[in-house]
Amino acid sequence: WIMGHMVNPFEQVDEFLNLGANAIEFDIDFDENGIAKYTHHGIPCDCGRLCTKSAVFTEYLDYVRQVTSPGDPKFRKELVLLALDLKLQRISSEKAYAAGVDVATKLLDHYWKRGWNGGRAYILLNIPLVEDYEFIKGFKDTLRKEGHEQYNAKVGINFTGNEDLDEIRKVLEKLGEDEHIWQADGITSCFARGTDRLEKALEKRDTPGYKYISKVYAWTLVRSSIMRRSLRLGVDGVMSNNPDRVVKVLKEKEFANKFRLATYADNPWEKFTPI
């Protein structure tokens, strides 16, 4: 999975897909009551990027629904995963449950259309800190109460704050979640980061019987050398401001026979098993 980073305005969706992304990450800004208002990152953000571009969240969902709905004039078959970077660290943890309710409701109304010609992409809920775990409860409770638990099959969970992997596992156990789990590791592109935690996450992913990590990705990579380093370690995905650089690296002799771009036929919740 090549995840385009910080794809917040409409016009950047096609821009990043044209550069080779098959997934996009966008930021969700909440008001003080946990209501999702805008796709917006804000200052500071990655070096070389404009931090302030935004869209109304519901309008953005309407747009990406079209991009991920076969038969729609805007349809792009390559876009198979939407990563929602939930800016919960900007609001009180007491509002995390309400935020989960609101995001689930807006996905039902504007993306899935409650079963009427909704978008098909997989959804990854990127939660910054384990203290915000109530978001997941609010989200799942809403799908159940609204009679649309079938969408759980499309939804995955990812804690993105580089916290202790065992602490993340404990929270997932507490929630009763042991599938559809991604693990991110990374830092803003402005800084360098070692691979210790990334390697630990990959080791857990590859441990037989370990349920709490099915995919691992590195973020936010802009240098080809760091992309190569991550691929050599065996990541499932890369988040980048420059998807075209990732595509170019994947075509190199070292990687061309080991990796390919994920398609809609690839289940993002299953561990990859080499043939």
Swiss-Prot record:
Its main location: secreted. GO terms for cellular component: extracellular region. It catalyses: an N-(acyl)-sphingosylphosphocholine = an N-(acyl)-sphingosyl-1,3-cyclic phosphate + choline; an N-(acyl)-sphingosylphosphoethanolamine = an N-(acyl)-sphingosyl-1,3-cyclic phosphate + ethanolamine; a 1-acyl-sn-glycero-3-phosphocholine = a 1-acyl-sn-glycero-2,3-cyclic phosphate + choline; a 1-acyl-sn-glycero-3-phosphoethanolamine = a 1-acyl-sn-glycero-2,3-cyclic phosphate + ethanolamine. The active site is at H5, H41. Binds 1 Mg(2+) ion per subunit. SUPFAM superfamilies: PLC-like phosphodiesterases (SSF51695). Its cofactor is Mg(2+). Its EC number is 4.6.1.-. Keywords: Cytolysis, Dermonecrotic toxin, Disulfide bond, Hemolysis, Lipid degradation, Lipid metabolism, Lyase, Magnesium, Metal-binding, Secreted, Toxin. The keyword Metal-binding applies. Gene3D superfamilies: Phosphatidylinositol (PI) phosphodiesterase. It is found in: Secreted. Disulfide bonds join C45-C51, C47-C190. Belongs to the arthropod phospholipase D family. Class II subfamily. Dermonecrotic toxins cleave the phosphodiester linkage between the phosphate and headgroup of certain phospholipids (sphingolipid and lysolipid substrates), forming an alcohol (often choline) and a cyclic phosphate. This toxin acts on sphingomyelin (SM). It may also act on ceramide phosphoethanolamine (CPE), lysophosphatidylcholine (LPC) and lysophosphatidylethanolamine (LPE), but not on lysophosphatidylserine (LPS), and lysophosphatidylglycerol (LPG). It acts by transphosphatidylation, releasing exclusively cyclic phosphate products as second products. This is Dermonecrotic toxin SpaSicTox-betaIIA1.
